[in-house]
Amino acid sequence: MAGHKVAHATLKGPSVVKELIIGLTLGLAAGGLWKMHHWNEQRKTRTFYDLLERGEIGVVASEE
């Protein structure tokens, strides 16, 4: 019975290269989403001020 050997998975430490690649990928994805959000907000603000300058909208409530 002492001759039976069971194959067990050996645990390895973290792979530095794999961790760097995963971190870089997640960072770039999050940064890209943040930039897209920022560009969208910037576009909305620019549109608002363009309409305000042309007189198509106003910031004061009109009296009826």
UniProtKB/Swiss-Prot annotation:
Keywords: Membrane, Mitochondrion, Mitochondrion inner membrane, Transmembrane, Transmembrane helix. The keyword Secreted does not apply. It comes from the Eukaryota. It is found in: Mitochondrion inner membrane. One of its GO terms (cellular component) is mitochondrial inner membrane. The chain crosses the membrane at residues 15-34. InterPro entries: COX5C. Belongs to the cytochrome c oxidase subunit 5C family. This protein is one of the nuclear-coded polypeptide chains of cytochrome c oxidase, the terminal oxidase in mitochondrial electron transport. PANTHER family: CYTOCHROME C OXIDASE SUBUNIT 5C-2-RELATED. This is Cytochrome c oxidase subunit 5C-2. It comes from Arabidopsis thaliana (Mouse-ear cress).
